[in-house]
């Protein structure tokens, strides 16, 4: 066991003494050491309940002959960080979490890990850190939040972001907005739609890293506690079997997860996180081109918020990820999982599917996959749109650019009534390096939707979008403006041509004009010159490479 390096022999007498000071016994030291990686925090609703899950996981470890050690990572709530400088820290926090998991597990000689994340960057961050060690691990995602209800109608967090836009144009009163505020977020769990946190939980299960039904079992469901306990027991078996993550995370496993993502219409942020996770196994193991290639293989089969009417609870009751795998089984390749059964065995074991929620491949919600990669002179290395949440009339759109050099400038313009039908809003210098931190543009996209402009106005950015964004929102434009990308050359009035069916995005300018404009820009001046974000800005790769640190 790896932990023998910490606890075995006379030379480790001081090490054992320190463990005994924590209450561990000689008998405990004969067993596998299992790290319980918790991300409990009192400021994030997705993580407020994780103490209960960590206790259950520890019980499972003890019951099956292991010794658990709990430690914590940070966890940022994207919703609370949204719309201000705090959002610059969200994506960069993924790397801090990965470093923390790697450091703690290696320093203390853990033989295996139970990862307990919920929200957006915490799920990939923990997995990335654990992969660097290549020791057995299992993931217990914290589970979705139930939607709230007011006057017979269901609400969730995105209802409030869009509600701000509705209030601005007089669709609702301030009193009505306050009532929705008080009920929309019903308690513990990740936001109730297929946003980034739940998208990553679904893909974690599809990768084979969580037990079946873990992704969609809700935070307040006792089944989540039982899954945590079972996962604690399972990790001890995995350590004894030496089932390493690289035995599970093959190229085929990643492609399975991408197919599930495309079929469900998950968050565009998955195109950052899946390549970043794969990068811990091998450089460019999975790239944006894999999403592009696989998007031609599956249709969009589930109409889930923000692009549809259903919530995560509906997906769960329809059969969860096993049911999705069952529907896609002709495309899925067989791979190992932490469950002990293969991914296709799990798919074949499904007893019930609600085909009103999880459509058959031959009767999809949309013929095209839920995500689309676009390329052209505006984004030579690619950009991403959640086409499953776009009005069909905006699949193809040509319009004049209105250019803003930050999210804050754009929000002021939108709420100030400066955007009209047909416009293409361009928000730049918000990329991984330029932002820095690649902020999510949920506030401007929600304002556009709330004001009823989502079927006539497009938005493109080198930043990114919340999983809750809907409408013609095209993000991750690469190269970014700070790196001299073409998006930096766009001026007000330039015609932007978008064709989501043909996967193209271009600015109607001659190459000579683009080169001339870029040559006049000079070298990008970093916005932040000290602290973590200053270091991050210098080291981060482009969005098409997963925004990983070089």
UniProtKB/Swiss-Prot annotation:
One of its GO terms (molecular function) is 2 iron, 2 sulfur cluster binding. [2Fe-2S] cluster binds at residues 119, 191. Pathway: Amino-acid biosynthesis; L-isoleucine biosynthesis; L-isoleucine from 2-oxobutanoate: step 3/4; Amino-acid biosynthesis; L-valine biosynthesis; L-valine from pyruvate: step 3/4. GO terms for cellular component: cytosol. InterPro entries: Dihydro-acid_dehy_C, DihydroxyA_deHydtase, DiOHA_6PGluconate_deHydtase_CS, ILV_EDD_C, ILV_EDD_N, IlvD/EDD_N. The keyword Amino-acid biosynthesis applies. Its EC number is 4.2.1.9. PANTHER family: D-XYLONATE DEHYDRATASE, D-XYLONATE DEHYDRATASE YAGF-RELATED. This is Dihydroxy-acid dehydratase. The gene is ilvD.
